[in-house]
């Protein structure tokens, strides 16, 4: 059966959008899950967070694509979730973390609405921001090898699958590793006699009343805002521009900021412009340039469909051998770690400030109940101003 050129023009962007959603979710949900659990979420609250975020940016992707006719795709903040892992529990527990998520959303919306604030964020030196991110990512990226020592029979196949897939089909490396991890979880559960909690397979939105504490605002909201802007929104906009599209910056950033504030009480930490998966819907594989907005719309619909899997992935994580989910999360972030290290140490002149920022962020120490990322940023800026004046 033959297809008309018109059919092909529709099929190509629709398929690209579906791939965008599938890769976007499967390649990073483990990081988000680890981040939410690290700051105090129960399994049900973590599932609610995954569901709220996926529904939230799914709806916003469709709206932005239809209004602007540009292949804008959104995502959760994967580096932001890594930040949550490195921060851990804060004073006030999960409700305080949720309060920090609300503040993060409002700050992002304010940055999008006020050009001067956006310019201020953009002035944070690249090497300092990248060094802070690299320090945040380091412990997560070490996790696969720690897990390998603890459970080699389960973790080794995951790492091998990731390496082989990285050689053959890099885009699918993490989904393939995840598939192998699911197989390992099933084998482990059958040996131990554990079974999935069927009641938790259907995800539900769970409301958490936010509380606000200064340690959570300073230790989570401020670094999360900076990481999300510097590592997601700015690179995401750059990807779209690289394909010749005009970026609807204000509407994208304001809507994702307000969207974050809305989904935060349900466990969502931050949503933003997609960076890692942005090229899937904006590139040539998504069809003729004037139809690539359809790929974004398709991605939004895909995310709405995939959102229903939030309960399943959390239930699987609950019966997983220790370390296997963290191993998948770490493998998913290795590329981001390498890129951030390259950005941090690209210029010899700034390596001292970048190095100290990286080491402090990687240390994970908490001062005055505020996590390492905030202090690493301050230290890096202070050292840069002191040692590297023009």
Regions from the language model: what does each represent?
Residues 2-5, 57-70, 107-119, 160-167, ...:
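C-terminal ends of transmembrane helices
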Residues 2-10, 34-60, 222-293:
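Membrane-embedded helical hairpins/re-entrant loop segments and their flanking transmembrane helices
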Residues 14-24, 173, 190, 205-235:
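Hydrophobic, membrane-embedded alpha-helices of multi-pass small-molecule transporters
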Residues 17-53, 64, 70-88:
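Transmembrane helix-boundary motif of multi-pass solute transporters/channels
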Residues 19-22, 59-72, 259-269, 364-368:
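Transmembrane alpha-helix interface/packing and boundary motifs in multi-pass membrane proteins
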Residues 41-64, 88-111:
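Extracellular loop-to-transmembrane helix junctions
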Residues 68-81, 121-129, 172, 246-251, ...:
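Short, non-helical or kinked segments that cap or interrupt transmembrane helices
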Residues 91-194, 298-390:
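Membrane-embedded alpha-helical modules
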